[in-house]
Amino acid sequence: MVRAHQLLAEWLGIKRVKLLIGSSIGGFQCLEWSVMQPDFAERAAFIATTPRTKPWASAFNESQRMAIECDPTYGERSAEAGLQGMATARSIALMSYRGGMAYDKTQEDENPDEASFERRVLSYQRYQGEKLRRRFNAYSYYRLSQAVDSHNLGRGRGKVEDVLQQIKAKSLVVAITSDILFPPSDHTILVENIPNVEYHLIDSDFGHDGFLVEHKQLNEIILNFLKE
């Protein structure tokens, strides 16, 4: 992925940028780019990300791939193949993106004491799966999940800790308190090994998706980082 971006930057004549920024999978690429081309960015921001995908995140991804594989149309040479399986995969992914606090905060029934089998959260899961089904491809989804699992900054380079020390850009690391996909503990290795780094923790009930929801907190952190 980074090599594709590098080719584009080269074609556009971009030799250096003020800020390289990425969150989640974008953070994977930001880290990779910062190592592959240490002088490309003056500053780099790594948000809700990790230098190496851990078993917990890969377990979610494998469950999603299993859901896609259960779709009887998966494997057909058609853009429509595997879409029902992908809708199910999306519902699995959402739980890892949001976490329990976010679900309890946003999907509780109007009258919890009277809640029956037909609960609000059930329609939410199906709606989100169908929404993705209308705009995405199951084969692309499957391959992207494999790309996430393959992420490892140390592969072919040595210990991740040593590789991180090669980053030259002034760096910002941002984690989210309730993120269960890439929890704050996953960011410790970044903070302890990137030479010139500052760390911020966003307080949010929205899990990994907190970087999409907590605009005010994140905006303030990034603006202050750029002013320094």
Which functions belong to the PLM regions below?
Residues 127-128, 143-163:
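Active-site nucleophile elbow and catalytic-triad environment of alpha/beta-hydrolase enzymes
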Residues 16-55:
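Conserved hydrolase catalytic core segment
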Residues 40-42, 46-131:
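Alpha/beta-hydrolase-fold enzymes
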Residues 131, 150-152, 177-182:
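Acidic catalytic loop of the alpha/beta-hydrolase fold
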Residues 156-161, 169, 180-192:
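Short alpha-helix in the alpha/beta-hydrolase fold that links the catalytic acid
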Residues 1-19, 28:
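Conserved acidic catalytic loop of the alpha/beta-hydrolase fold
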Residues 188-189, 196-228:
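Catalytic active-site module of serine/aspartate enzymes centered on a nucleophile-bearing elbow/loop
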Residues 167, 173-175:
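Short beta-strand/loop motif that positions the catalytic acidic residue
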